[in-house]
Amino acid sequence: MKKQLLAALIGGFLLAPMAASAADYVIDREGAHASITFKVSHLGYSYVVGRFNDFSGDFSYDAKNPTAAKVNVKVNTLSVDSNHAERDKHIRSGDFLNTAKFAEATFVSTSVEDKGNGDMVITGNFTLNGVTKPLAIQAHAVGEGQDPWGGYRAGFTGTTTFAMKDYGIKMDLGPASANVELDLVVEGVRK
């Protein structure tokens, strides 16, 4: 009886799937499966919408343990694109992004809170215009699985809002235009 129980335990251990661990992914910007867009109120009447065309990053993620996730993103602020060349020149100036001095923005996660059903709050250090402050991103796991090319992918969306003045942007466009909304779409390819 003891031998049968021992054999069953050993067999069960050997046949049981190993505990899942976080997988590492690279953000698929080159395949145009990721985007960083922004929206700022234009004097309270409408919105200026734009994007950053050049960014890179990676993340670790395990759906069974989202709190262990890690995210690192670098954004080339020179790549700002609001579909208006003169406005983009102004956004790159010292009035806003000061890209001559700070050509890169970064986000490095410090914690992830699992809200259930794929929802998370990813908190990290966001550096923009030479200023680093904590920033929380409301994120959602869209899905994951095999792709047709033999790889494995995981996708997420995220949103966050920050005040321009918190990052040393002193241009005052009025209270309706004080905040920037970021919308993130991220698809990663497992390394």
UniProtKB/Swiss-Prot annotation:
Sorted UniProt keywords: Periplasm, Signal
Pfam families, alphabetically? Answer: YceI (PF04264)
- Give the signal peptide range: 1-22
Q: Which SUPFAM superfamilies match?
A: YceI-like (SSF101874)
Q: Where in the cell is it found?
A: Periplasm
Q: What are the annotated GO cellular component locations? A: periplasmic space
Residues annotated as transmembrane = none
Its main subcellular localisation, reduced to a broad class, is periplasm
**Cystines in this chain:** none
Report the NCBIfam families cross-referenced here: PRK03757.1
Family stated for the protein in its record: Belongs to the UPF0312 family. Type 1 subfamily.
Q: Which PANTHER family does the UniProt record give?
A: PROTEIN YCEI (PTHR34406:SF1)
Protein name (database record): UPF0312 protein Shewmr7_1249
